[in-house]
């Protein structure tokens, strides 16, 4: 905005200008973080997908498992957009946390389901939820409580970081527990 204004006002003069200050530095830092976050997440999704292909030896299973973090990250960014929460130094890291946790939960559930299907395809989904599902849920709730501690801060970005991270962990666990058994058990 300022750059456009000055360009229009000073276009017929010999005056050169340079916009500087902490605001410009902070804006450039956020732009750099945002750009590198997109590149990094793209690389991470491809690398994880390739590892899942090796682990499960099934394109469909790898696709379902990698789909969970995509949904979780999408839901977090949608929530941020709905509530006009800006991307800043704190909130930009939530996508990485979400990907890490949701891949972990998804692998646990998918692997257990695969093992249970070898024993009995009729009870595989139920047995998966009762065994690994409980562990994933308890772990997720523990981590959610840990992140909710940030909501007691006096610093708004820290509060948002805690709340969004907690939501991210909850969504990751919930999506893994609900979608993976129902999708993979029908195949």
Go through the PLM ranges and name each one.
Residues 7, 11-187:
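Membrane-embedded transmembrane helical bundles of large multi-pass transporters/channels
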Residues 1-5:
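Well-ordered, non-membrane alpha-helical segments in soluble/globular domains
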């Amino acid at each position: 905005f300022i750059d456009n204004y000055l360009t229009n006002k000073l276009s017929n003069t010999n005056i050169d200008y340079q916009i500087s200050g902490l605001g410009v530095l902070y804006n450039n830092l956020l732009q750099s973080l945002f750009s590198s976050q997109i590149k990094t997440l793209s690389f991470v999704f491809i690398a994880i997908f390739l590892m899942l292909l090796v682990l499960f030896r099934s394109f469909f299973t790898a696709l379902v498992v990698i789909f969970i973090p995509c949904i979780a990250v999408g839901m977090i960014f949608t929530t941020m957009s709905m509530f006009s929460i800006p991307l800043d130094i704190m909130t930009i890291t939530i996508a990485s946390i979400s990907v890490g946790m949701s891949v972990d939960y998804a692998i646990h559930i998918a692997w257990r389901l695969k093992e249970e299907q070898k024993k009995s395809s009729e009870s595989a989904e139920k047995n998966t939820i009762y065994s690994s599902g409980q562990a994933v849920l308890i772990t997720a709730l523990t981590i959610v409580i840990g992140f909710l501690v940030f909501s007691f801060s006096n610093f708004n970005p820290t509060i948002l970081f805690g709340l969004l991270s907690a939501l991210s962990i909850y969504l990751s666990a919930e999506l893994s527990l609900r979608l993976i058994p129902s999708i993979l058990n029908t195949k």
